[in-house]
């Protein structure tokens, strides 16, 4: 081989090595820092910059509903007063009724798609289990996302001009300007990002720190390569993500579907009156760490036989300390707030777990993790949206 050929081969080899080194940087996942906690805040939220010019808005993360909405500067009788100035829409933001995004949202919310009354806009109404509701129109605007190429996709979301409060609404909207609804659907933000090629897989996940905070990610690049327990997603549970029926080792057989959801008070709710319990010590308790040694881990078991999978729930994930120093079981009676036979795994149960919702393969996964740094990557820093 001539010296020129050898030199050219060496140059190509170096170029290939540089390309391989760059591959890990070409991620399609989007990571957001989570704020809030299970108690006493009662919600986890992300900050997103929306519009042109971009303005910050805090969005309460809800994996049980498919609608993302902001409180708009056109209220009728809204009771919500968020931390930032209300979003101000323009006529160019309005999504018409015959738009595919409107069709998807109406389908996700179980609404009739009828454009005869208001063909120029996409109206919606959505009610939550706790009595909260949002009435509004669908808009589209730019979202500034923390990606390598600084994507600013045009995404559809709700402009809520009439919000009615439920049991938790007053507390939640002190911290939030709206809701980031990423429940199962075809018009939710994660689905839109996949459709626009911003992420390659319709997968998202979250990790909730036991002392608050954590992270949320969209896309499959941040899924751990090993150590994840997977179960199939149950069907026919609406917009909830569910691993199906489960057994909780509190001598409670949860024969009805279990929904995995980050919403409401972030406490787990099951259909059993016996679970609302509190205890008092001689002196008021200040921290869960002071009493967790007196409790044993619980287990949630899904499936049967070879397909059986178990999630261990340490004491710090199912007990809470109240402001008055009582120790309470953080598992509430869901039938009292209209959940009927649906049991919800709340944010408290999922603390210090990375939870993965894989819509590509219709499965849910979890793994124990530190929620203050990404697995195998640099420590988590706040997202600059």
Residue map of PLM features:
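Aspartic protease catalytic domain
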Residues: 2-14, 18-19, 28, 35, ...
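Residues that flank catalytic or metal-binding motifs in active/ligand-binding sites
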Residues: 44, 66, 139, 153, ...
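Short coil/turn segments at secondary-structure boundaries
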Residues: 72-74, 170-171, 194-195, 219-220, ...
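C-terminal reverse transcriptase regions that engage the nucleic-acid substrate
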Residues: 181
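Flexible, small-/acidic-enriched active-site or ligand-binding loops
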Residues: 217-263, 326-327
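Acidic glycine-/aspartate-rich tracts in secreted/extracellular proteins
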Residues: 74-76, 149-150, 186, 222-223, ...
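Signature of the N-terminal lobe/flap region of pepsin-like aspartyl proteases
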Residues: 32, 39-155, 159-168, 266-277, ...
């Amino acid at each position: 081989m001539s010296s020129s050929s050898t030199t050219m081969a060496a140059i190509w080899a170096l170029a290939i090595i540089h390309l391989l080194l760059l591959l890990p940087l070409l991620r399609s996942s989007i990571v957001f820092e989570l704020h809030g906690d299970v108690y006493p805040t009662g919600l986890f939220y992300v900050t997103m910059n929306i519009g042109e010019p971009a303005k910050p808005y805090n969005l309460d993360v809800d994996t049980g509903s498919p609608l993302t909405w902001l409180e708009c500067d056109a209220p009728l009788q809204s009771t919500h007063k968020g931390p930032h100035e209300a979003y101000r829409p323009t006529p160019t933001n309005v999504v018409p009724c015959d738009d595919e995004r409107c069709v998807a949202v109406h389908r996700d919310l179980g609404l009739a798609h009828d454009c005869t009354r208001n063909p120029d806009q996409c109206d919606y109404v959505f009610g939550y289990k706790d009595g909260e509701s949002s009435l509004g129109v669908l808009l589209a605007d730019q979202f500034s996302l923390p990606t390598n190429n600084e994507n600013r996709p045009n995404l559809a979301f709700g402009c809520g001009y009439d919000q009615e409060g439920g049991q938790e609404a007053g507390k939640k909207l002190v911290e939030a300007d709206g809701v980031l609804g990423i429940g199962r659907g075809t018009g939710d933000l994660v689905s839109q990002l996949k459709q626009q090629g911003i992420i390659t897989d319709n997968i998202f996940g979250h990790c909730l720190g036991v002392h608050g905070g954590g992270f949320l990610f969209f896309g499959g690049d941040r899924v751990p390569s090993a150590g994840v327990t997977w179960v199939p997603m149950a069907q026919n549970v609406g917009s909830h993500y569910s691993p199906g029926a489960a057994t909780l080792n509190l001598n409670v057989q949860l024969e009805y579907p279990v929904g995995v959801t980050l919403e409401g008070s972030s406490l787990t709710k099951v259909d059993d009156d016996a679970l609302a319990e509190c205890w008092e010590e001689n002196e008021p308790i200040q921290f869960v760490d002071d009493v967790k040694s007196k409790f044993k881990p619980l287990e949630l078991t899904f499936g049967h036989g070879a397909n059986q999978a178990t999630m261990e729930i340490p004491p710090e994930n199912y007990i809470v300390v109240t402001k008055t120093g009582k120790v309470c079981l953080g598992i509430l009676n869901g039938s009292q707030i209209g959940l009927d036979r649906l049991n919800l795994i709340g944010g408290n149960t999922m603390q210090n777990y990375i939870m993965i919702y894989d819509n590509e393969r219709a499965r849910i996964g979890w793994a124990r993790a530190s929620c203050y740094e990404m697995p195998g990557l640099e420590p988590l820093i706040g997202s600059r949206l």
